Design a protein with these regions (language model features):
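Selective recognition of hydrophobic, aromatic-rich stretches within alpha-helical transmembrane segments
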Residues: 2, 56-90, 137-174, 204-240
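Short, surface-exposed, polar/charged, turn-prone segments marking secondary-structure boundaries
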Residues: 45-46, 124-126, 135-136, 186, ...
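Membrane-proximal helix-loop-helix units in multi-pass membrane proteins
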Residues: 117-146, 150-151
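Interfacial aromatic "cap" segments that immediately flank transmembrane helices
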Residues: 2-35, 93-120, 155-208, 244
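Short, small/hydrophobic-residue-rich motifs at membrane-helix boundaries and re-entrant hairpins
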Residues: 3-12, 16-87, 101, 106, ...
Length: 244
């Protein structure tokens, strides 16, 4: 059995994979970001309108859920792009739309499951935000709910980071089987997932200082590194020729 690769080695492989493809990776990330931004603008304006009726507000929240799912499936296309790159397969901007044009029921179903799990984790936060204030007699309840939501969200983050990767990689498994398999894969790898995420904090701070422009470089690097972590966990990475 091949030993697990360290974060430094995964990042080296990722830089090699991105060499000569950084412009394409930036374009893919920018495409997803702009679609997300412009699709959300009309509904953000609707909620920001002080004269918005209750019906309009309800429409906004329904639209937000639907858009979140659509953008999530778009993000799955971004994952597929990086999987193709890591596996030395052809990668192009059209990979972003792969999940809409191929077995869309599977990919939409998978993301709806993931979205539902995420919303369950956020439920205490939503309750606290809408029913309680951080002042007066309800402050303690609000803080407890915020803390509970933070803990649940963290659990989701560390338990299911490989779920969507599995859905895209294992056509032989149902979306529910991918869910249980993702939990099996994370065993013994939680600290690796946390470390990879923490190691990019410094770069993300620089992205904030650059008003987000730095994300064009950092996001593809992070995505490719995490993709290689997934391939390492599944045992596929050692079989991939990492030569440029």
């Amino acid at each position: 059995m091949n030993p697990k690769k360290k974060s430094k080695e995964l990042k080296r492989i990722s830089r090699e994979n991105l060499n000569g493809r950084y412009r394409l990776s930036m374009s893919v990330f920018l495409t997803v970001t702009l679609i997300n931004l412009f699709s959300d603008l009309p509904f953000t304006y609707l909620l920001g309108n002080v004269y918005a009726t209750k019906v309009q507000t309800v429409i906004y929240y329904i639209a937000e859920v639907l858009l979140s799912i659509v953008v999530g499936v778009l993000q799955m296309g971004l994952i597929r792009f990086h999987l193709n790159m890591a596996r030395k397969k052809e990668c192009r901007i059209s990979n972003v739309f792969y999940c809409f044009m191929n077995h869309s029921n599977r990919y939409f179903g998978a993301y709806i499951i993931y979205y539902a799990i995420s919303m369950i984790a956020k439920a205490p936060f939503l309750v606290a935000r809408n029913l309680f204030n951080l002042s007066g007699d309800t402050m303690g309840i609000a803080i407890a709910l915020y803390a509970a939501s933070a803990v649940l969200s963290f659990i989701v983050l560390v338990l299911f980071p490989f779920y969507l990767y599995l859905v895209l990689s294992r056509d032989d498994l149902s979306v529910f089987a991918c869910l249980t398999h993702a939990i099996k894969l994370i065993r013994g790898n939680i600290l690796r997932v946390i470390y990879i995420n923490v190691s990019f904090i410094g770069m993300l701070v620089l992205c904030v200082l650059s008003l987000g422009i730095g994300l064009l470089w950092v996001e593809p690097y992070y995505e490719q590194t995490f993709t290689n972590l997934f391939l390492d966990v599944t045992g596929e990475l050692p079989t991939v020729d990492c030569a440029v």
